[in-house]
């Protein structure tokens, strides 16, 4: 029995990057032998074994044979006769198909992973890559993760990804797997690259048609030097990435920014850019996308609010006090003040996603916080003590909040 460190841990070690997870491969052993040594088996389809001391995961070497459509259509062989190279060849990219002997430290690299690391190249190992449609998303995610290091996708790999898209294999992916890869991609160093790659291989129109239709939609040059709405969205995503450490819910912030302009291309030209009324079409599209991918509720809710109200936030200094209070009520900031922070970050990312405005301040956020702090300080108990009852309490609370917002507005 031989044990190897495999996959991302070997790759990241060679790139001098922090190693987050360590995956171990066992060659020349059976499940029974591992169990007899104290390993605990977890999982049925792809058995993984927990080390009796470290609780780290160990997997038996395996071969795979395509038996159907989608990423689940495989027959696996876990026999002790499966070699290290036979296991590694089933992996997606050469840089993920290296193994390190735990005893000697020697690195096995049968497919040129080291060379591709040096050349900053994401390259598939063989045509068997096409057997798993999820790999289209995975490669896009790796491109997003390593873009800042200068990595690009090999032309042959891009061509194969395009063929996989064209043959309909992506239609077999479940919502859960699409969202899982996308959420990981959002938290890479360059999430916009994920969507650029998917668009380049024609997968964006299949997986994210609501996002794809933003590309080619022309914006007013007066307000957007980057006239394509899709490009503006990706610029906004880059800006959100710079702000994400301030977010209470980072995933929600990034997803909201991605969805903030959905449907805007369907608003009449006369209303742009001053369309302060809710974008009903955008709300529908944001709902549709989130529901199809089974996006978590909190993530979906912020995206809906940002899509609906971000233009109001940009013009908050021009809104009357009643509309400011209405905005706060719609955001439910009294019960969820952290949501206001993330909403404002999303609006700031949008405002800065204009060529030449990348490092501009966003005073609207400061004003919104001032309005909120003052309005939130209104004492409900004082209203009750003044004799107001039932619905009159709510009405008076709104009136006092409006008045204090008005005082701040008049003092500006």
Swiss-Prot record:
Residues 229-334 form the HD domain. Gene3D superfamilies: Beta Polymerase, domain 2, cca-adding enzyme, domain 2. Keywords: ATP-binding, Hydrolase, Magnesium, Metal-binding, Multifunctional enzyme, Nickel, Nucleotide-binding, Nucleotidyltransferase, RNA repair, RNA-binding, Transferase, tRNA processing. It catalyses: a tRNA precursor + 2 CTP + ATP = a tRNA with a 3' CCA end + 3 diphosphate; a tRNA with a 3' CCA end + 2 CTP + ATP = a tRNA with a 3' CCACCA end + 3 diphosphate. GO terms for molecular function: ATP binding; CCA tRNA nucleotidyltransferase activity; cyclic-nucleotide phosphodiesterase activity; magnesium ion binding; phosphatase activity; tRNA binding. The keyword Magnesium applies. Pfam families: HD, PolyA_pol, PolyA_pol_RNAbd. PANTHER family: MULTIFUNCTIONAL CCA PROTEIN (PTHR47545:SF1). Monomer. Can also form homodimers and oligomers. Comprises two domains: an N-terminal domain containing the nucleotidyltransferase activity and a C-terminal HD domain associated with both phosphodiesterase and phosphatase activities. This is Multifunctional CCA protein. The lineage of its organism: Bacteria, Pseudomonadati, Pseudomonadota, Gammaproteobacteria, Pasteurellales.
